[in-house]
Each structure stands twice: as C-alpha cells, then as structure tokens.
Amino acid sequence: MKISFHGQSCIKIITGNTTILVDPFISGNEKCDLKAEEQMPDFIVLSHGHDDHVGDTVEIAKNSGATVICNADLASFLAVEDGLENIAAMHIGGKRQFEFGQVKLTQAFHGSQTVRNGRIINLGFPTGVVFTIENKNIYFAGDTGLFSDMKLIGELNPLDVAFLPIGDNFTMGPEDAAIAARFLQTKLVIPMHYNTFPLIEQDPHKFVASLDEGISGKVLEIGESIEI
C-alpha cells in the first residue's frame, strides 16, 4: 500500500487497483501538487464539511464516479445540494467494509459547516477515520484538538500510522499533537494541516523531533509517499 501527502490534509491511498482520496482540497490550495480534473479515485473520504477539506469532491466524484464516504449529515447535503449519487453515509463509532478494507469513523473536536448562498449550513459532527487496509491500521485524525479518548482509539486499533494536524489555531498545535501521538501509541506519526495559510505555519521537523522515544515521525513533502 502506498500513501502520499498532497498538502493541508489531502492524502491519497493506493492499495492494489483501488485509489482512495482523502479531504481533496486541491483548487485554491497553492500547497497541493494535484490537479482536480486529473483525479480518478475509486473512493473519496471526507473528515468534515469545511471547504478546505471537501474541496473538489463534487467535481472529482462526478468525473470519476467515485463513492464518497462521510458522515450522514454531510452525505445528505452533498446528495441534495450537489446531486451526488454514490455516497456511503456513516456516523461516529460505526465501521463498514468496502472492497479495499474497513473504515471506522471516530470523534474529532472541531466544527463542520459551509456557507451556501449566504446561509451558514451545519454539516454534522467532524470525524477522524481509522482505515484498516492490508492488515494495517491508519488513523487520519482530521481537524481536531487533543482529547484523552485518543488513548482508546489506539487501544482498540493498534496503529501503524497516524496523520495528525499540527497547525494550531484551528486544530491542535505541535505540543498537543506530540501528546496525541503518546496517547495513540502509534508506530509512525506524519504531520498534516500546516503551512497552507499564515495562521497555521509550523516547523514539521521540529514537531517530529519532539516526539517521545519509541515513536517515529516522518515529514512527507508535497507529493511524497511512503509504502507500508
């Protein structure tokens, strides 16, 4: 399985012949190396409804026929307002098997809304995601602050990789993210959600250096990938 990082919180997972795109904030993101019109994933996974995470989902899903996996409230909005048909609606605590493996939604402490035609629309609870693919557990925290039940996420799902936001201001910063890594007891931590905007500028290498002994960290440059 190959996992690549594409700026902000956008990652791509390739397992066998299946491609999964997560939080595809591409257009308007100077830190992203992808082009929305070239993306042909089989699945799109959304952590929540903020524009810098939903991003180009509608265009990509309509062009590719991808199934969108997200919380049920956001799923209803995308179906009614944007005409998406291939949607797998879930909620926090639920897990579901797909052709590539299992998806389980976890809680996240953040918001989830958009503005459409001058209206503020709430889009349900934000989520994290635990992927179980090829007998590996990957935790994508989404946008979140630190919370103590991260310990439980790690206990229930022994983690091989965790993608954690470090940008501060809108999510946890590097100090709290290092505590999150300790709570999760993951084998590898990859920072995300930083340096896209001035308010979330951070040094990811300094964050990786701050991790507890026994927890590995890796900074993925834009477009860089790892194999697990």
Curated annotation (Swiss-Prot):
Keyword Lyase: no
Keyword Zinc: no
UniProt xrefs under InterPro entries: Metallo-B-lactamas, RibonucZ/Hydroxyglut_hydro, UPF0173, UPF0173_UPF0282_UlaG_hydrolase
Pfam families linked: Lactamase_B_2
Entry keywords, A to Z: Hydrolase
GO molecular function term, any single one: hydrolase activity
Top-level taxon in the UniProt lineage: Bacteria
Family note: Belongs to the UPF0173 family.
Name of the featured protein: UPF0173 metal-dependent hydrolase lwe1590
Naturally occurring in which organism (per UniProt): Listeria welshimeri serovar 6b (strain ATCC 35897 / DSM 20650 / CCUG 15529 / CIP 8149 / NCTC 11857 / SLCC 5334 / V8)
